[in-house]
């Protein structure tokens, strides 16, 4: 079984993130080949990784491609080199030594898999994971509270892409990340596409990883182009009809004025609508691509 782990780095030396991340892969009980795609770091990451982890496949970039497109480079390399599974792992994340074994044991080969996301020191659930996890039938919480034997996996809703295990079959069906998203939102869009193509998301409760971040990660990066991202997540949601898209855009406008007023800049929403109209052909083409199956966005 060939497993590749794709890690996108950008100034990954802070808090020794990239060192801890790659060391956790070396300690995995299942062999895994690391693919590191660096988004033009300036903090020594570009020197540190090839020197200390010479077995990692190293793809330094001359500009910041963003999270999705950088991952696409690593995903394509993994597929081209016979990957059975592709692990997407954040630079600020580490996996438990048995995580890959437990994830692959629970795999049906046709579903996305995720371990339980813990905080940086592994003492509690990652905050975003805690508030977003939604098992489909409630049996996970029932089994936990009643101290029953846990199943290998439980179907769930959307899970952050800090640690995704993608069977190659899923990637060949769904493709890579949509390049219209630069940083944040690309995993939400990918989940929308999984839902459209009826690909399940499975949580493996005995597998764990640690995500060393504050609540919203990089707050500056998260808030940058927030409204563009919100608009894109609506208009590129291939589960929505035209009517539903218009309804969701109106809701976004009302929320912008009612709840996000402090962060609202005069004309922001109108500007995003003008941008949307000027890129309508690109949006429609992207929706068509996302509705098709195949290795879209990877060529």
PLM segments and residue spans:
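A conserved acidic beta->alpha catalytic loop
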Residues: 24, 38-46, 63, 93
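Glycine-rich, basic loop-to-helix element that forms the pyrophosphate-binding segment
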Residues: 61-81
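Short, acidic, metal-binding catalytic loop of nucleotide-sugar glycosyltransferases
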Residues: 23-32
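Conserved donor NDP-sugar-binding/catalytic core segment of glycosyltransferases
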Residues: 96-128
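Short beta-strand-to-loop acidic/aromatic patch adjacent to the donor-nucleotide binding site
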Residues: 83-94
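A short, conserved alpha-helix in the catalytic core of glycosyltransferases
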Residues: 157-175, 180-208
């Amino acid at each position: 079984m060939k497993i590749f782990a794709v890690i996108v780095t950008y100034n990954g030396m802070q808090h020794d993130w990239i060192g801890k991340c790659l060391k956790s892969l070396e300690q995995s009980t299942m062999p895994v080949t690391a693919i590191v795609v660096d988004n033009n770091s300036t903090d020594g990451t570009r020197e540190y990784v090839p020197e200390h982890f010479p077995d990692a496949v190293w793809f330094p970039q001359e500009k910041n491609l963003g999270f999705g497109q950088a991952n696409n480079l690593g995903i394509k390399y993994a597929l081209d080199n016979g990957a059975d599974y592709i692990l997407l792992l954040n630079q600020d994340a580490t996996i438990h030594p048995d995580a890959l074994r437990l994830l692959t044991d629970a795999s049906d080969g046709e579903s996305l898999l995720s371990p339980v996301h813990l905080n940086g020191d592994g003492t509690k659930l990652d905050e975003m994971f805690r508030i977003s996890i939604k098992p489909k039938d409630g049996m996970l919480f029932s089994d936990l509270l009643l101290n029953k034997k846990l199943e290998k996996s439980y179907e769930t809703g959307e899970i952050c892409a800090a640690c995704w295990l993608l069977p190659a079959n899923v990637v060949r069906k769904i493709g890579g990340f949509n390049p219209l998203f630069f940083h944040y939102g690309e995993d939400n869009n990918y989940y929308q596409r999984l839902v459209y193509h009826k690909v399940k998301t499975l949580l493996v409760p005995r597998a764990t990883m640690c995500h060393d971040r504050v609540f919203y990660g990089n707050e500056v990066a998260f808030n940058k182009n927030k409204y563009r991202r919100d608009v894109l997540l609506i208009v590129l949601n291939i589960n929505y009809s035209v009517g539903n898209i218009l309804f969701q855009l109106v809701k976004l406008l009302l929320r912008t004025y009612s709840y996000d007023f402090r962060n609202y800049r005069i004309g922001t929403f109108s500007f995003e609508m003008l941008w949307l109209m000027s890129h309508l052909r690109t949006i429609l083409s992207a929706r068509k691509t996302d509705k098709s199956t195949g290795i879209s966005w990877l060529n």
